[in-house]
UniProtKB/Swiss-Prot annotation:
Biased composition (Polar residues): 73-82, 100-118, 206-230, 463-478
Record's GO cellular component terms: plasma membrane
InterPro entries found in the cross-reference section: LSM_dom_sf, MscS-like_plants/fungi, MscS_beta-dom_sf, MscS_channel_2nd
GO biological process, one term: monoatomic ion transmembrane transport
Protein name stated in the entry: Mechanosensitive ion channel protein 4
Gene3D superfamilies hit by this protein: 2.30.30.60
Designated gene of the protein: MSL4
Chain intervals with Basic and acidic residues compositional bias: 56-66, 492-501
Function: Mechanosensitive channel that opens in response to stretch forces in the membrane lipid bilayer.
Organism of provenance: Arabidopsis thaliana (Mouse-ear cress)
Membrane association type: Multi-pass membrane protein
Comp. bias regions, Acidic residues: 234-245
Length: 881
């Protein structure tokens, strides 16, 4: 029920949670109908309260006032509702003039969040925030206070707002929290967060202190050190990959408690073995008709066999590391399977010792079958470890080859893009080099004149900075001028000491010479790092560098970063960035390669603001999609590993049964019958899993973020799993496809397609002069040739068809300088071309309209009066007259 009066309008000010909760006696807890009665008492009768009701505060003043006309109407309506026994409801609309006064203060953010803290907020602002539909509520109690008379003074106005018509509502915190969680749950990973109110990249700044999450931290905590990959000049390095193929954590030997215990037992058992062989009394001692020293050797192998096998593994690893080719290709897998190999050697030593110490003679003397079963158990354990070793090696080899063949090119391009963004957002290197030479010349001048200067620290003569991709800052290290920048992933303090990847090494890598360690490090840079920019000034301290580094985590921040880069690189007042501007930040080869990244820059040799903005935004999208792809692939590999573990465990169990002799004919008959039942129940599921694995790892037709077309519907890949793939349709509806079903469907991938064509068709009249059509064709070709950043030159334009004898269809097939992954950009360029074609047709006076048709009348009826029942009689009379 909306309150409105043509004679007089009253202001209804509603305050939510705005009153002190200490005065509980001021709240009305009884039926809301009785509130409208002229009750003189300030305390409400009764004290029971209902959790599902609205609690409205009464007027603080006990002085009764004459209700105004709107209040009388409300009173009459509520009394009628009470008499009829119907449910009472109050409708307050957003267009009520009582709720649209300018005197109402704005709504605070705390009130909208649904918290129960005392916050003053009007209902008017809640309408603006989209909560107007929550105003209409049907409850058992609704209590309103009469309106307040108009006041002239400011004090009266303040008192009127604070003490008169105030509504205290209990906020539903759990409902709003549930809505927020549902919104976060259904949000796509490929969609940006809401654009911040203030255009500042605050979300990308990392605080000075606190624990850093490796997935979100923006910097490497330790600067470059002389023993990193970029510490020496390229000419001085005989093996550029010698220090990078082996992680620092594997070089350090970890000493655990078990190793210490093994060393202690090794010393004690060797001492007891020497005593049993030297002392005559112990030399003749036997246990179960077996010499004492044999038992000691058996215990030594059981307890200290892992220690001895670890020595053998370390010796093998040392020989692998000494060979360059083996180190690049084999070392990663050697470190991955060194534990299973160590267990194999240990069990092999135990089996050899058991076989040669407890020979057939001892077995005949003891007349027991226990030794035979112990031997079989040892053989079973050794076979199980060997099979597990083969399984681990195969999974690692297949996963490494899959990542290397599928994602290496994208990772290399993404890291170079990140390097370009960070370098262009920092200070010019040529200026740093000139400043360093100036400082060095000044130092030499002072030394010549005889002044003794204190040794310069790293801050006095700084070396050219090292760019750490993902770290978000330029790192300074005490190396010489001309050193190649270093790329490393962002990580926590625990992972911050990991060495980086030099940019020149990155450019020389390919799928043939990259090692598995290097590929794993590149993947970590993508998965745990983010695009970042640098402010123009580089500070000396690490904390100041941390505050200056800014990460790009949304397309909005990417646009801000592009604007900062343009202001940093372009000359003051210039509208474009030229090759000379790039040369101030990058080398000549890097500048040429960077120019090729921009659309149309290789032809016109300049970059506009819009082109730079689109490039940074596309780089952010590509980086986000690649990181999500690698994460999903890692999850899929882990799940595949678990599936293979189950299958291998079943195979090992069957082999154990065969070795132990348990698998008799009757046993196999029972197992086969049960196996048939299992195949009947789970056969289809196993087939589906196998087809899904083949689809994900062998076919692999798309990655996360790719635009695909399946059954005529264009969709974006949202998430990839072992069994299913989640797509986003054009209206952001999530569609889940089983991978086994996708394997049987043709899939069109726009992202992996080359530059794609477009088709434009339009009609002209057949009577259009040929001169106009020729001029139209030439002007269209001229327009396309001038748009070098959008279209390939010389598109095909032909007269394709003729519709009767009235019009001619002209078809045009221009080729974009991109594929249709970004469908919005495709239609923008197509729309601009259509607008140009329409403008050219108007200029050339080319129109399509039907000419008048000639109608030939062969005969007319005789000139006799026409009599018809459908014509009024008065018309016939007028004709006869």
């Amino acid at each position: 029920m909306a309150v409105d009066s043509t004679d007089q309008r009253r202001d209804f000010v509603v305050r939510i949670d705005g009153e002190d909760n200490g005065d509980s006696e001021k709240f009305w807890r009884e039926s809301s109908i009785n509130f409208w009665h002229n009750d003189k008492s300030s305390k409400p009768p009764g004290g029971e309260e209902d959790d599902g009701s609205f609690d409205f505060m009464r007027r603080s003043s006990e002085k009764s006032e004459e209700p105004d006309p709107p209040s009388k109407l409300i009173n009459q309506f509520l009394n009628k509702q009470k008499a009829s026994g119907d449910e009472i409801s109050l409708d307050m609309e957003a267009n009520m003039p009582e709720l649209q006064k300018n005197t109402v203060p704005p709504l605070s953010s705390t009130a909208v969040s649904g918290s129960a803290s005392p916050v003053t907020a009007p209902v008017t602002a809640s309408y603006r925030n989209g909560t107007g539909d929550a105003i209409r509520r049907r409850q058992n109690r609704v209590t309103l206070s009469p309106s307040v008379k108009d006041g002239d003074s400011s004090e009266d106005e303040e008192n009127r707002v604070d003490g008169s018509e105030v509504v205290k509502c209990t906020s539903n915190r759990s409902t709003m929290r549930t809505k927020t969680l549902m919104k976060m749950k259904t949000r796509s990973r490929l969609m940006d967060p809401p654009t911040p109110t203030y255009p500042d990249m605050v979300s990308g700044r990392t605080p000075r202190s606190g624990n850093l999450n490796p997935g979100f931290s923006g910097r490497n905590t330790k600067p470059g050190t002389p023993n990193q990959g970029g510490s020496k000049d390229l000419e001085e390095e005989e093996d550029p990959f010698s220090e990078e193929d082996l992680p620092e954590g594997l070089r350090k030997e970890k000493i655990c408690v078990w190793v210490i215990i093994e060393w202690i037992f090794l010393i004690l058992i060797i001492a007891s073995l020497i005593c049993s062989l030297v002392i005559p009394y112990l030399r003749g001692k036997t246990l179960w008709d077996l010499a004492l020293w044999k038992w000691e050797v058996m215990v030594l192998v059981l307890i200290c066999g892992r220690l001895v096998s670890s020595w053998i593994v370390k010796l093998f690893v040392y020989f692998v590391e000494s060979n360059f080719l083996w180190r690049k290709k084999v070392l990663y897998f050697v470190y991955g399977i060194r534990k299973p190999v160590q267990n194999c050697l240990w069990l092999g030593l135990v089996l050899i010792a058991w076989h040669f110490l407890f020979d057939k003679k001892v077995e005949r003397e003891m007349r027991s079958t226990v030794l035979k079963y112990v031997t079989k158990v040892l053989i079973c354990l050794l076979v199980a470890v060997i099979i597990w070793l083969i399984k681990t090696l195969l999974v690692k080899v297949l996963a490494s080859s899959f990542h290397m063949s599928t994602y290496f090119d994208r990772i290399q391009e993404s890291l170079f893009t990140q390097y370009v963004i960070e370098t262009l957002s920092g200070p010019p290197r040529i200026e740093i080099h000139i400043e360093e030479e100036k400082v060095a010349n000044d130092v030499k001048t002072f030394e010549i004149v005889g002044r003794k200067l204190s040794p310069l620290g790293p801050k006095a003569v700084s070396s050219p900075p090292q760019v750490t991709v993902g770290s978000g800052r330029l790192q300074k290290s005490p190396s010489r001028v001309g050193k190649s920048p270093v790329l490393s992933r962002s990580g926590s303090k625990k992972e911050g000491g990991e060495e980086g990847i030099r940019i020149d090494h990155l450019q020389r890598m390919n799928t043939k010479n990259v090692s598995a360690w290097k590929m794993k490090k590149l993947m970590n840079v993508i998965k745990k790092g983010t695009l970042s920019t640098l402010d123009e000034q580089i500070q000396d301290t690490t904390t100041q560098e941390d505050d200056k580094a800014t990460q790009i985590r949304s397309e909005f921040e990417a646009k801000l970063a592009a604007r900062k880069i343009f202001q940093n690189v372009a000359e003051p007042g210039s509208r474009y960035i030229y090759m000379e501007d790039f040369m101030r930040f990058l080398s000549e080869d890097e500048s040429e390669r960077a120019m090729d990244l921009f659309e149309g820059a290789s032809e016109c040799h300049k970059i506009s603001k819009s082109c730079l903005k689109n490039w940074v935004v596309n780089a952010f999208r590509e980086r986000r999609a690649l990181a999500l792809t690698l994460n999903d692939t890692k999850t899929a590999v882990n799940r595949l590993h678990r599936i293979v573990d189950v299958l291998v465990s079943i195979v090992i169990l069957i082999i154990w049964l065969l070795i132990l002799g348990i698998a008799t004919t009757k046993f196999l008959l029972v197992i086969s019958s049960q196996l048939l039942l299992v195949v009947f129940v789970f056969g289809n599921s196993c087939k589906t899993i196998f087809e899904a694995v083949i689809f994900v790892f062998v076919m692999h037709p798309f990655d996360v973020g790719d635009r695909c077309e399946i059954d005529g519907v264009q969709m974006i890949v949202e998430e990839m799993n072992i069994l299913t793939t989640v797509f986003l349709r054009f209206d952001n509806q999530k569609i889940v496809y089983p991978n086994s079903l996708l394997g049987t469907k043709p899939i069109a991938n726009y992202y992996r397609s080359p530059d794609m064509q477009d088709a434009i068709e339009f009609f002209v009249h057949i009577a259009t002069p040929p001169e106009k059509t020729t001029a139209l064709r030439q002007r269209i070709l001229s327009y396309v040739d001038n748009k070098k950043d959008h279209w390939h030159p010389s598109p095909m334009i032909v007269f394709r068809d003729m519709c009767g004898l009235n019009s001619v269809k002209i078809a045009m097939w221009p080729t974009h300088k991109m594929n249709h992954q970004n469908m919005g950009e495709r239609y923008v360029r197509r729309g601009q071309l259509l607008e140009e074609i329409g403008r050219l047709c108007r200029e050339l006076d080319i129109e399509y309209r039907l000419y008048p048709l000639n109608i030939n009348v062969k005969s007319l009826p005789a000139a006799t009066p026409i009599t018809s029942d459908r014509i009024p009689p008065s018309w016939n009379q007028q004709r006869s007259v």
